[in-house]
Design a protein with these regions (language model features):
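Short beta-turn/strand-loop junction motif enriched in small, turn-promoting residues
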Residues: 50, 105-107, 177
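Predominantly the C-terminal beta-signal and adjacent terminal strand-loop region
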Residues: 71-75, 152-197
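Gram-negative (and chloroplast) outer-membrane scaffold detector with strong preference
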Residues: 62-138, 162, 166, 195-197
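Cleavable N-terminal export/targeting peptides
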Residues: 1-39
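Short leucine-rich amphipathic alpha-helices used at interfaces
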Residues: 137-138, 144-145, 150, 194
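Extracellular loop and loop/strand-boundary signature of outer-membrane beta-barrel proteins
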Residues: 48, 84-91, 138-144, 175-180
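Short glycine/proline- and aromatic-enriched beta-strand/turn motifs that initiate or cap beta-hairpins
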Residues: 29-83, 190-196
Length: 197
């Protein structure tokens, strides 16, 4: 065998490998459009962070389904926070909410491997006041043990598919708690994973 024929064989092999990679990449991009197809169910687990960095992170779990150009979800979240009392003590509280959202896709890559959604929904929950009994007992907070809360929550969310059934999520929700004794508006930043099932 001559050096020229070896070089030709090597170049041919490299060309074949490159063509195979291009075919695999393009087919995976086309297939990723099916990741958000109508009727596809998904589960998500996300950490929820308050706008104030001193507040510990909460958590959210959701189950939903993609529609033609949107998705719907049902969720439950727990998001601790605190308010400062007139006595300068901090009253911790934990809202525990269940809710439902409708999210409309406003932007996406052609293959839908990156999507941006805007929407919102409604929620119902219970606000638990001073769950760890950090406020001295002689101080009357006027809050009681807890309070029923409800309202609506506009939201924005992006998803970045890193595998056929796995996406990273990043978003924000601003619950408007009509009956809350602590805060009417409260911004949460969410980040987590979503698994298509």
């Amino acid at each position: 065998m001559s050096i020229k024929s070896n070089k030709t064989e090597i170049l041919g092999s490299i060309r074949s490998i490159l063509i195979a990679c291009i075919v695999l990449f393009s087919s995976s991009q086309i297939a990723s459009a099916q990741r958000t197809m109508k009727g596809q169910y998904h589960l998500a687990a996300e950490a929820a962070f308050a706008a104030d960095p001193r507040v510990p992170a909460g958590a959210e779990i959701s189950f939903g389904a993609y529609l033609l150009d949107s998705y719907v979800i049902g969720w439950i979240n727990v998001t601790p926070d605190f308010v400062t009392l007139p006595t300068d003590h901090q009253l911790g509280y934990i809202p525990i909410n269940v809710g439902a959202d409708y999210m409309y896709r406003v932007a996406a890559t052609r293959a839908r491997s990156v999507n941006l959604y805007v929407g919102g929904g409604v929620f119902l929950g219970w606000e638990l006041y001073d769950p760890f009994r950090k406020v001295p007992s002689y101080i009357d907070t006027g809050f009681g043990k807890g309070n029923l809360i409800y309202g609506m929550a506009p939201a924005v969310e992006s998803e970045f598919f890193i595998a056929r059934r796995l996406a990273l999520t990043l978003g924000a929700r601003m619950p408007v708690s009509i009956s809350s004794k602590t805060e009417i508006l409260k911004l949460h930043i969410k980040a987590g994973i979503r698994i298509n099932i």
